[in-house]
Regions:
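SAM-dependent methyltransferase catalytic-core segment centered on the flexible catalytic loop
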Residues: 47-108, 266
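A short acidic-Thr-Gly-centered motif at the start of a beta-strand
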Residues: 20-25, 41
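Class I S-adenosyl-L-methionine
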Residues: 2-17, 27-30, 45, 52-53, ...
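Well-ordered alpha-helical segments embedded in enzymatic catalytic cores
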Residues: 39, 94-95, 234-238
Length: 310
């Protein structure tokens, strides 16, 4: 049976954090409490290597969903309530613009979302003059069924990878050699297959078509559960590919701190922004456990071998 012990975390090169008072912090991470637009405005320009954003999907407006096989109201919090399509888009465009200000010339931005918000984000990026680098589909094999039986089950999310458009050749960081090595010596495509350990290949021709990752495992929620928590494995691939070693990763909607957990394990530094005290406390517990090497052994990346073929 393979060992569940986690390999030692990579040592970080010495690099200062932006000089801002943090709600909580460790040697390689900091959490800032408050509105993301206000906190982003306080950060120095060109100080961040990578932004991963999982913004509100604006779904908490009295609707219903399926939770553990039962009908349940969609009520994640006031932060997820829509204020109307125009105001929602104005907010989306505002935080994207704020992220662009703090990105280094080699920096880039990832946005995760469903159809409820991702097209607004894409239009905002285009209207701000960003370069759309890739879109990726994240397939959830354990997605909840739909209740109305009037449309297909929502079993995927879209991720946009983009960078501010700058004069000259592309400058954004991309670890092409590492991604190619992980893909068996072939160029990695913008649609990946990352099956669960033990799964068989998903395609008859061996070509990976989408990122196949389950929702966060129970071990990843050992210290608490966030309603929109992302799996650590998803963030591992993103950060490993697009943030330099020792670089600063920013999450303006940090929630339970998953981005920070993945960043620390990969030898990157992390700065998170969150306005909800409950999720700040959860993120702090996870990051402190990670810094101390006491995080749950199961809250890991899983096997390093990737079944991506395309």
């Amino acid at each position: 049976m393979p060992s569940t012990a986690r390999a030692p975390r990579p040592r970080l090169p010495s690099a200062p954090f932006p000089e801002l008072p943090a709600w909580a912090s460790g040697p390689d991470w900091a959490l800032h409490a408050g509105d993301c637009l206000e906190r982003l405005a306080a950060l120095p320009e060109t100080s961040v290597d990578l932004v991963f954003a999982d913004p509100p999907y604006f779904l908490s407006n009295g609707g219903f969903t399926c939770h553990s096989g039962r009908r349940a109201p969609v009520g994640k919090g006031t932060w997820d309530a829509s204020r109307g399509i125009e105001e929602d888009h104005r907010f989306t465009k505002g935080w994207i613009e704020a992220c662009g200000r703090v990105l280094k010339p080699s920096g880039s931005l990832w946005i995760s979302g469903t159809q409820h918000v991702i097209f607004s984000a894409g239009f905002a990026l285009q209207s701000l003059g960003w370069r759309l680098l890739n879109t990726v589909t994240w397939f959830k094999p354990n997605a909840s069924p739909n209740l109305s039986c009037r449309y297909f089950t929502h079993s995927s999310e879209i991720l946009i990878w983009a960078a501010p458009r700058r004069p000259g050749r592309l400058q954004h960081h991309f670890d092409y050699p590492r991604m190619k090595a992980e893909n068996g010596g072939k160029q990695m495509r913008d649609v990946w297959a990352l099956p669960r350990p033990g799964d068989e290949e998903l395609d008859a021709d061996g070509q990976g078509r989408i990122w196949t990752l389950t929702s966060p495992r129970l071990e990843e929620k050992a210290q608490g559960k966030h309603p929109t928590q992302k799996p650590v494995a998803l963030l591992r691939r993103i950060i490993e590919a697009t943030a330099p070693a020792g670089g600063l990763v920013l999450d303006p909607f940090s929630g339970s701190g998953t981005t920070g957990v993945a960043a620390l394990r990969l030898g990157r530094r992390f700065l998170g922004i969150e306005q909800d005290p409950t999720w700040l406390a959860l993120a702090r517990a996870r990051l402190e456990a990670e810094s101390d090497g006491a995080g749950p052994a199961g809250d890991s990346f899983g096997p390093r071998r990737s079944r991506t073929r395309g």
